[in-house]
Amino acid sequence: MSQVESPIKIKVDTQYLEQQSDVADNKYLFSYTITIINLGDNKVTLKDRHWIITDADGEQNEVKGPGVVGETPTIAPNTAYQYTSGTVMETPVGFMQGSYGMENHKGERFVATIPPFRLAVPGIFQ
């Protein structure tokens, strides 16, 4: 695979889902909204995802699969694609990170890295 520079910028917003969580059973639910921005001059297509979810105990859950939320979106130049998904952890704080396997308009594959971001129950660090 050739080295193709990624024109992708990724923004993440997270939310603790208190109503769906069961603290007594150590089930903490979080949603995350991802915005994938194509800063390049050509369209790109998201082909697959790879997540590493790490809780406060250091337990890791790895998730791989095609697309995101059932889609393999094509993102036009200077536009964005946004989706919301969720995860459950056994601790009130943790981290997610990963990557998207992308394809450019020439059919060349490249990786868009998702930097680590924190999932935390509000007030946990006060």
Swiss-Prot record:
GO terms for biological process: error-free translesion synthesis. Residues 2-126 form the ApaG domain. PROSITE patterns: APAG (PS51087). It holds the Pfam family DUF525. PANTHER family: F-BOX ONLY PROTEIN 3, POLYMERASE DELTA-INTERACTING PROTEIN 2. This is Protein ApaG.
